[in-house]
Structures are given as structure tokens and as C-alpha cells.
From Swiss-Prot:
GO terms for molecular function: double-stranded RNA binding; ribonuclease III activity. Residues 288-310, 320-330 have a biased composition (Basic and acidic residues). InterPro entries: dsRBD_dom, Raptor_N. It comes from the Eukaryota. The lineage of its organism: Eukaryota, Viridiplantae, Streptophyta, Embryophyta, Tracheophyta. The keyword Repeat applies. Pfam families: dsrm, Raptor_N. It comes from Oryza sativa subsp. japonica. This is Double-stranded RNA-binding protein 3. GO terms for biological process: regulation of gene expression; RNA processing. Residues 1-22, 288-331 are annotated as: Disordered. Binds double-stranded RNA. Residues 35-104, 120-187 form the DRBM domain. One of its GO terms (cellular component) is nucleus.
Length: 437
């Protein structure tokens, strides 16, 4: 087997000296199309030879391998250039070397056409145009009036026109024009810079891996937490004082004296207590406010009676123009007299007192309690206080001391009954002493 490793250079007339088309980049060349294996296979078919066989070897370390390929055609081996980094490029280089050597070995009078004269030139030129995103090459053939070669063809690619040699047929003229364009493109400046090599497929320079530049991550500013809106709910607070449990419910109604609702009267809060010693029940009403109290037995019941009717209790009515005056040092209310005296009758047993507030007194936040007493005195000559005197006791119903005040009044009346005269009215205070109005 004959082996050729050092091919002879081409004649000077076949050197690549034509400039590359305008717009062609150095990174994309004709050899990137990899058509030399196809050319070699087409040549073998036309010559009646066997299909070319490629043998590729791998050398060097695993991270930087080096490939070298050998092609066998017509019992002749052709080796590729050394230093390729991939198998495909090494095989293309071996096919190119084989084609170059076959062209030189073919006699001039042979019937087999040269590889450059086949239709692969047009295919190669079209594939190159697609790689470069150019338009499809256009061929314009003209027929001169005189001459042995009647057809001349011009091909345009990348904005540059290339004129081929004259040919007897239109097809041959297009092939020659494509061949002229390929030779011009292959003679670009990059091929000249690599030592003006006659081969197209040459090993490229290895490009080191660029260090990955990670973008500097800027920390995102923390978002301020939004303040949560607290919902106001109606809460029940249980307060214990002196053994009394009071259930207070928050009222979201409009408050009296508000800037927008100045005409709205304040509705007093309903205070409900269990019936026990000294417990006071207060309930508001539009026409009259009724206060019910169920004290122990030692407290007398007083009910209002305008017509002086006989009953178990006496009627207590506050004055229309009464004013509430509360003493700062005590929870005791100041009693104001009424213009008209209300008669009271003696009753043998009085257990509790029923008190009624007045509307005008409610506006000020206090309740006027008028206490008319039916007292059984024995002996009557002991009393030195003038009879028929009205007694009024003003007590703040919102004060926790109101039940205690009534309890004290009842104890005072029960313990000092000898000082009271029948049908007499007196001013009552929490102090055990009694004062005349």
C-alpha cells in the first residue's frame, strides 16, 4: 500500500489570491461547511471506486484531546493535518488532502473531470451564502455574438459579482462562475495570515475557557412591615367591688355633645346588678327614669303619690328646676327642697324605697331622689323639729356609693325614729345627724 503523507504544493496559478466578499467575517469560512467528504465520495462514485474509509485516532489528555484522521481510497491512504480538537474537523482535513493529491495525479488528457469542475461548486457556494445569511446566489448568463465559447456567466453573492470563464454550455458557465467565486472567498485575509497555506481545513487555536463573571448581587432592602389594623370589638369587663359584679358593655353609639351630632342626647348606660344588699337597678326611659332598689328590710320604700293616696309607700317627685350639686368629699348628694310640700302618711311597716329621676336631672348625668317619709313617732313630744317640711336627697345613680347611701339612710331612720314627728319632712344625709330643711 502506498502512503502519501507530504503532498506537494499546488501550482502558482491555483493559489488563493482573490479577496473575500465585503461583509464576510473571519469566524465563518467556506471550510465550516464541511463538504470535502461529500466531494471525495462523489469523485469515488464517478470513478467507480469504493467508498472512502476514515480511521481517526485520539491522542493527548482527556481535557485537551487531539484528533488525527486517515482516509483510504483506491488503496491509498491520506493523512490529515495534526492538531485538531474534534473528530469531524480531522476527517474533513483528511478528505481535503486526498482531493488535492488526486487532482495532481490525474493526467491532463483524462476523461474524469476535476472536482472543481463538478456541480459541487454551486452547492458549496449556496451553502456558504446560507451560513452568511446572504441571498441565494444569482447567475446571469450571456451569449456573445461571436467566439468559440458562446456562454459567459456572472454570479453575485454578498453584493459582489464574480465572472467565470467561457463555456460551451450554460451549465458549464454557471459552474465556472461558482468556482471563481469560491476561489476568491477562500483566499480571504485569514488564510493569508496563517502562512498562506494551500489547505482550507486547518487546526484552529484553542480558546481558553473564560472565567465566569458572576454578577455582584446587591442585597435587597428589607420591606417595612405594615402595621396591622386592630379591630375594635365589644368587650365585656367584669369588675368586682364590695362583692358586686357589674357587667359593662361598650356602646359605640353617638356621644352627646359631639361636633357633628350636638343635638343628640347621651343615653345613659344600663347597669344591671343582682338583687342583693344595697343593690340599685337603673334603667333609662324617654319620659321618666325609674330606679328600682331592693335593699334589705332595714331600708324603707318610698313611692311618689301626687294625690296623697293610701299605699305602702310614699311618692317621691324631684323638682323640675332642680340642680344637682355633689359634694366633693363624699358620694352623698345635696338635697334641694321642693316648692310644694307633699304629704306623707304613717305606715306600720316600710321595707324598701322606689326612686324616680327627672328628665332635666338626667341631662346633667345625675338623678334627683326626693324622699318623703312616713314616720311613726312615740312619743310625739320628743320631736323638736317643725312639721310639714319636705326632704330631698340627691344621689348620683352612676356612683357605686348610691346603694350604700340608701342603706345608711334606712339605718338612720330605723335607729332614730324617736326624733321624727308624724307628717314631717327632713333633709337626709349619710351622717347620722339630722338637719332641718
Amino acid at each position: 500500500m502506498k502512503k502519501k503523507s507530504a503532498p506537494t504544493p499546488l501550482p502558482p496559478e491555483t493559489a488563493n489570491t482573490s479577496p473575500a466578499p465585503i461583509g464576510a467575517t473571519a469566524g465563518i469560512r467556506v471550510e465550516n461547511c464541511y463538504v470535502f467528504k461529500s466531494r471525495l465520495q462523489e469523485y469515488a462514485q464517478k470513478a467507480g471506486l469504493q467508498t472512502p474509509e476514515y480511521h481517526t485516532s485520539k491522542e493527548g489528555p482527556s481535557h485537551e484531546p487531539v484528533f488525527k484522521s486517515t482516509v483510504v481510497i483506491n488503496n491509498t491512504s491520506y493523512g490529515s493535518l495534526p492538531g485538531f480538537s474534534n473528530r469531524k474537523a480531522a476527517e474533513q482535513s483528511a478528505a481535503e488532502v486526498a482531493l488535492m493529491e488526486i487532482v495532481k495525479s490525474i493526467p491532463a488528457n483524462a476523461n474524469i473531470p476535476a472536482v472543481q469542475e463538478t456541480g459541487l461548486c454551486k452547492n458549496l457556494l449556496q451553502e456558504y451564502a446560507q451560513k452568511m445569511n446572504y441571498a441565494i446566489p444569482s447567475y446571469i448568463c450571456t451569449k456573445p455574438a461571436s467566439g468559440l465559447a458562446p456562454f459567459l456567466c456572472t454570479v453575485e453573492i454578498g453584493g459582489i459579482q464574480y465572472i467565470g470563464a467561457a463555456a460551451r454550455t450554460k451549465k458549464d458557465a454557471e459552474i465556472k462562475a461558482a468556482r471563481t467565486a469560491l476561489l476568491a472567498i477562500q483566499g480571504q485575509s485569514e488564510g493569508s495570515a496563517n502562512g498562506a497555506t494551500k489547505y482550507i481545513v486547518v487546526p484552529g487555536k484553542r480558546v481558553g475557557k473564560e472565567v465566569e463573571k458572576r454578577p455582584i448581587e446587591t442585597p435587597k432592602p428589607l420591606k417595612a412591615k405594615k402595621g396591622g389594623f386592630k379591630k375594635k370589638w365589644n368587650k365585656r369587663k367584669f369588675m368586682k367591688k364590695d362583692g358586686q359584679a357589674v357587667d359593662v358593655e361598650k356602646d359605640e353609639a353617638r356621644v352627646a355633645g359631639d361636633a357633628h351630632d350636638s343635638d343628640v342626647l347621651m343615653q345613659p348606660t344600663v347597669i344591671t346588678q343582682e338583687a342583693s344588699c344595697g343593690t340599685l337597678f337603673l334603667q333609662p326611659c324617654e319620659e321618666a327614669k325609674r330606679v328600682e332598689d331592693e335593699p334589705p328590710r332595714d331600708i324603707e320604700m318610698v313611692q311618689p303619690d301626687k294625690e296623697n293616696q293610701h299605699s305602702d309607700a310614699a311618692l317621691v317627685q324631684p323638682d323640675d328646676e332642680a340642680r344637682v350639686e355633689q359634694e366633693p368629699s363624699r358620694d352623698i348628694s345635696v338635697v334641694q327642697p321642693n316648692e310644694e310640700a307633699i304629704s306623707a302618711k304613717q305606715e306600720p311597716s316600710i321595707d324598701a324605697a322606689t326612686l324616680q329621676p327627672k328628665e332635666e336631672a338626667m341631662k346633667t348625668g345625675c338623678v334627683a331622689l326626693v324622699l318623703c317619709l312616713n314616720i311613726s313617732v312615740d312619743p310625739p313630744d320628743v320631736i323638736k323639729i317643725s312639721p310639714c317640711v319636705r326632704k330631698e336627697c340627691w344621689i348620683d345613680p352612676f356612683s357605686m356609693a348610691a346603694p350604700k347611701a340608701l342603706e345608711t339612710i334606712g339605718k338612720t331612720l330605723h335607729s332614730q325614729y324617736e326624733r321624727w314627728q308624724p307628717k314631717a319632712r327632713y333633709k337626709l344625709q349619710l351622717d347620722p345627724t339630722l338637719e332641718e330643711v
